[in-house]
């Protein structure tokens, strides 16, 4: 209880800039590590062929869905554990951890079963037997051996619920390093490994995830913590499962939006524009842009806790100062991202284009899409503000506008009217403008009625 109080005092009295840096930097590093898995895979797979890159780009939405289920379930488990630890009920917290890990195990088994019959998914987008074969080779391995990513993410959330964010970051770093080392060895057959192509990329990924999982399990089960996870609690408890999924299912839905968007965009490129190059280009963009967006998400995730605390403490000046600082930092991050994508698109795309088939398309894509980055800084800052002050529905609506509600219809119309891949990229700018317009109008009303009437408090 005393430690919790100190944490609360820090949230309310530590200088905002120092507090934001203190909370955001570990999150930024953790998220960048997650982004590296797919970026590294794409870099080495692109050295095989553009078709290989297209195949794993088609597989990516299913990988995103797996991670969405893992993160969503783990968020629900984390929320349940944190509440029980706050109540001083360590036995219930332990039961929440055990039940959460059990749910993650069951989820991994379901995905593994579907991994054996994944071929029809690729036939939705292409009739090319080589693309289908490479896609199945890659995704089947990732799904059948996907237990690593589920349990690793679950253990990371268990550690985070106990305030051990540094330990959770270490497990991610170790897994990423293993993946980066093994990728070229297993793809190209270096040293003791046979040449395995896209299958090698998949094996490198799952081995990295399993190494991270084993390390995370060791830290959870064998390191001294305030809770002890017992195997006897691995029997599912209906009430605990309901509490986990009460928070977890909305999180899974939110996390799945990106997967659905990827499927929709791939369908537009493959079935309307008949462009495998469009699929490969979008796959490269979506993975590279995560390196720009992950620092943004790290900052906004940290800021959400600061916003929520000072909103609850009715400290208007500190709330406003932290909000303005967050908007400024995110705008700088995204402006740097835009600048890099505008000035060096050829250099970035060429890293993933050994055959020269997507460079021209990639240059246009990176320059057009990156125009929405600074707008996204405002959109996402506003969205997490809604979450922090209890307007989660508005936050969800903004996410749907950004990635589904406006983006996919705009992409479809642009593809049908202009019949070019380049025209489709403008859907990102259109969707971002729509989302930020809704966000500004909604936040202005809320600010006037909920933020401005708060007492000044102390701005630090």
PLM regions with names:
Residues 53-116, 149-168, 266, 281-339, ...:
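Small-residue-rich hydrophobic transmembrane alpha-helices
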Residues 74, 78, 142-160, 168-176, ...:
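Short runs within selected transmembrane alpha-helices of multi-pass transporters and secretion channels
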Residues 32, 36-54, 122-129, 185-196, ...:
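Helix-terminus/linker motif at the lipid-water interface of multi-pass membrane proteins
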Residues 22, 44-64, 130-134, 198-199, ...:
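Interfacial/gating helices of multi-pass transporter permease domains
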Residues 22-41, 141, 152, 175, ...:
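Transmembrane helical elements of multi-pass membrane transporters/channels
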Residues 65-68, 179-184, 213-217, 290-294, ...:
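Hydrophobic transmembrane alpha-helices of multi-pass small-molecule transporters
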Residues 13, 17-36, 40, 62-69, ...:
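Residue-level signal for short hydrophobic patches within transmembrane helices
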Residues 1-24, 81-147, 193-249, 307-372, ...:
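Short alpha-helical transmembrane segments in multi-pass integral membrane proteins
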């Amino acid at each position: 209880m005393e430690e919790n109080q100190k944490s609360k005092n820090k949230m309310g009295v530590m200088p905002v800039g120092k507090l934001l840096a203190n909370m955001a930097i570990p999150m930024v590093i953790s998220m960048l590590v997650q982004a590296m898995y797919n970026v590294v895979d794409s870099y080495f797979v692109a050295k095989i062929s553009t078709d290989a890159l297209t195949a794993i780009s088609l597989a990516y939405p299913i990988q995103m869905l797996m991670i969405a289920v893992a993160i969503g379930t783990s968020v629900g488990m984390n929320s349940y554990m944190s509440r029980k630890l706050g109540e001083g009920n360590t036995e219930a917290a332990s039961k929440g951890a055990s039940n959460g890990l059990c749910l993650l195990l069951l989820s991994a088994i379901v995905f593994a079963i579907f991994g054996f019959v994944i071929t029809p998914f690729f036939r939705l987008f292409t009739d090319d037997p080589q693309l289908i074969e490479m896609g199945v080779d890659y995704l089947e391995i990732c799904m059948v051996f996907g237990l690593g990513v589920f349990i690793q993410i679950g253990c990371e959330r268990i550690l985070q619920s106990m305030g051990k964010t540094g330990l959770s970051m270490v497990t991610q770093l170790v897994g990423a390093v293993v993946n980066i080392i093994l990728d070229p060895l297993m793809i190209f057959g270096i040293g003791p490994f046979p040449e395995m192509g896209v299958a090698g990329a998949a094996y490198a990924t799952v081995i990295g995830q399993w190494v991270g999982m084993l390390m995370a399990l060791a830290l959870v089960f064998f390191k001294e913590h305030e809770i002890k996870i017992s195997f006897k609690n691995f029997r599912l408890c209906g009430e605990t499962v309901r509490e986990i999924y009460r928070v977890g299912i909305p999180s899974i839905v939110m996390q799945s939006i990106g997967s659905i968007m990827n499927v929709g965009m791939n369908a537009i490129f493959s079935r309307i524009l008949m462009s495998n190059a469009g699929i490969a280009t979008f796959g490269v963009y979506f993975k590279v842009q995560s390196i720009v967006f992950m620092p943004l998400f790290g900052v906004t995730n940290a800021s959400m806790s600061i916003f929520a605390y000072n909103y609850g403490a009715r400290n208007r000046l500190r709330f406003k100062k932290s909000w303005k600082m967050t908007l400024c930092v995110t705008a700088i991050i995204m402006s740097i991202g835009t600048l890099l994508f505008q000035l060096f698109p050829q250099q970035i795309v060429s890293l993933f284009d050994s055959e020269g088939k997507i460079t021209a398309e990639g240059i246009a894509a990176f320059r057009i899409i990156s125009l929405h980055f600074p707008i996204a800084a405002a959109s996402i800052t506003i969205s997490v503000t809604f979450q922090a002050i209890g307007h989660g529905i508005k936050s969800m609506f903004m996410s749907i506008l950004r990635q589904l509600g406006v983006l996919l219809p705009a992409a479809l119309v642009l593809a049908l009217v202009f019949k070019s891949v380049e025209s489709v990229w403008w859907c990102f700018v259109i969707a971002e403008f729509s989302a930020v317009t809704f966000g500004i109008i909604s936040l202005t009303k809320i600010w006037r009625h909920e933020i401005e009437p708060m007492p000044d408090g102390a701005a630090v």
